[in-house]
Amino acid sequence: MKQVHWIGTGLSSLPGIRRLAVNLENLTIWNRTLEKAENSISHVNKSNVKAKQFDIDLIFKEVNPGDIVISQLPATRHPEIAKLCLKHKCHFASTSYLNPEIFALDKDVKQQDLVFINEIGLDPGIDHFFSHLLVQDLKKLTSNNIEVIYESYCGGF
């Protein structure tokens, strides 16, 4: 697998970062402060999971075609990141709603055979995704025939 670059380590990022850090071979976490990036992967003892201080110019010197960039930055930054992903032939994912600036990239994204995924935010995206992971983990610990009922409040169970 190519390198995955996760930008931003806010509270809603931590479950995703931790899951990827355990399961991926090539992960770099970028954050405004290096300390927060390091804390987000402090439980992982893998030399191929790195933490770096976010710098827009630096990250796009390190990406390679086919890499995946996940942006958890504020929505106003996503068009800038998406355009740079297109320029560097990287796949892009964000939690933000599809806006006109990102939508305008669609033709070029398709022509370059890239994947840009948006609107995978808390509801329904990440919240539902981590709900499935929670149930999957529970089933590993118990019988697969159990019934799981719970309520989710934006990631809080």
Predicted regions and their residues:
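ADP-ribose/adenylate-binding Rossmann-like module
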Residues: L84-I102
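Rossmann-fold cofactor-recognition segment
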Residues: N45-L58
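Hydrophobic/small residue at the entry helix of a nucleotide-binding pocket
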Residues: S12-P15
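N-terminal Rossmann-like NAD(P) cofactor-binding module of classical short-chain dehydrogenase/reductase
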Residues: D67-Q72, F92-S94
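Rossmann-like dinucleotide-binding core of oxidoreductases
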Residues: L114-F157
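Conserved N-terminal Rossmann-fold NAD(P)-binding element of oxidoreductases
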Residues: V4-T9
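NAD(P)-binding Rossmann-fold cofactor-contacting core
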Residues: L24-I41
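Rossmann-fold NAD(P)-binding glycine/threonine-rich loop
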Residues: S96-N118
